[in-house]
Amino acid sequence: MFLTLDDFELEGKTVALRVDINSPIDVNTGDILDDTRIKACSDTIKSLSEKGAKVVILAHQSRPGKKDFTTLEAHAKKLSEVLNMEVTHVDGLICASAREAILAMDNGEIILLENVRLLAEEVLSDWKSWEEITPEKQAKTVMIKKLHPFFDYFVNDAFAAAHRAQPSLVGFSYYVPMLCGRVMEKELFTLTKVLKNPERPCVFALGGAKADDSIEVLKNVLEKQTADQVLTSGVVANIFLVAKGYKIGPNENVIADMGYTNQIEIAKELISKYGDKIVVPIDAALNVDGERVEKELDLNEEITYPIHDMGEKTMKLYEEILKDAKTVVANGPAGVFENKNFLKGTEELLKSTANSKGFSVIGGGHLSAAAEVVGLAGKMDHISTGGGACIEFLAGKKLPVIEMLSKSYEKHKL
C-alpha cells in the first residue's frame, strides 16, 4: 500500500516533487529531442498545482562526464509548454537563492531546481547495495539536510529511477510523508496487477540484449505461475537455443563476449523445469553480408552467420500464441531493429501484442522506442516509463523507492 496525492490536503503546503525527465538532448543546441518523460509527469505537476500546493520539482539530466549533462533550463521551458503553465527555472539547488525562491512561492506556483546530479553525493551512492543505504543515512546528506525543512510532503513520481537509492529519491522520506505521483501510481497498479492477478492466458515476450535481466524475469514469472508461456527472442532466445543443443556459431561468441555464458546453464535448468512453457524461435533471419537471409533452425546444422532477427515462421508461431492471450507483457526487441532489414520481427511482435484480445503492457527502453518508430505505441494499453525499473520489478526484485513508499505508508497512513 502507498500514500497518494489524494490522501492529504495539500493547499498551501510546500511539496518536493521528484520526477524523471532525463531526456535526449541535442548537445550542440541544447534542445530537448524527445519530451515523452516530460509529458508523462505533467498530470502530477498539474494536479499538485491545482490543489494549491507550492510545487518544487527535483530532477536530473544525464550524469557528470556525459556530453548531455547539463542544466535544467531547457526542461523548465518544455514543462511550461506542455503544461501551459509557468514553470520557473531556479539556477541553484541548495544555495541561499534556491532556498529563498522556495520561501517566496505562492500557492499553485511551480519551480524547477537545478540538476540534482550537480551534487557529488547524488552520483556516488552505492546502488548495488542499496539495502545498506537507509533513509537515515541518506537523510544526512547535504541536499536533504539543507532542503527538508522547507517541505511538508515529498512526492516521488520517478518510476524510471525507482531501482536507484540516491538521496533525492529516498532521503526526504525520513522527515516527511512520501507519496506516489500519478506516474508512479499507475505503474505500480498496472505492473502489480500483471504480476499478481493477470487475466489468462498470460504470455510474456522477452527479448533484447540484456539477457540476464530478461532471464530473471522469465524465472520469476514461471516460478510464481504468473505466465502461462514465455516467448523468447534476441540474445535471450540465442541463449535458450544453445541450451537446447542448437549450434549457432558466431552467435555463441557474442553470448560469451557479453558475459552471458553462465546464463546457458541457467537456461538449461529452466528448460528442464518448465519445458514447453519456454518457446524459442524455429527460424532466424541471418545477416549475410548486410542482407536478410532467413533460415530454419536445425539441431543437426550449424548457423554460420549472425542472427539479427527472428524468421517469418517464428513470427507466425508467436502471432498464433499471442492472438488469444488475455494478458501480454513484452520487453526487449526481437532483433537488431535499428537496421531496417531486421526490423520486421520486432514490428510483427508489436503488431501481435497490439492485436491480442487482452491487456497489453510494453516495458520501457528499446521496445517502447521501437513501438514509436513503427507507429504502434498508441495501440498498447500501457507503456512503462521505466526500462531498468520495470524489468527489475517484473523480476520480483525489491526497488528502493518502492520500499520507501511502503514504509512511508505504514508510518503516516491515516
Curated annotation (Swiss-Prot):
InterPro entries: Phosphoglycerate_kinase, Phosphoglycerate_kinase_N, Phosphoglycerate_kinase_sf. Its main location: cytoplasm. It catalyses: (2R)-3-phosphoglycerate + ATP = (2R)-3-phospho-glyceroyl phosphate + ADP. HAMAP family: Phosphoglyc_kinase. One of its GO terms (cellular component) is cytosol. This is Phosphoglycerate kinase. The keyword Transferase applies. It is an enzyme of class 2 (transferase). The gene is pgk. Pathway: Carbohydrate degradation; glycolysis; pyruvate from D-glyceraldehyde 3-phosphate: step 2/5. GO terms for molecular function: ADP binding; ATP binding; phosphoglycerate kinase activity. SUPFAM superfamilies: Phosphoglycerate kinase. Substrate binds at D20, I21, N22, R37, H60, Q61, S62, R63, R117, R164. GO terms for biological process: gluconeogenesis; glycolytic process. Its EC number is 2.7.2.3. Signal peptide: none annotated. Belongs to the phosphoglycerate kinase family. Monomer. It is found in: Cytoplasm. ATP binds at E338, G364, G365, H366, L367.
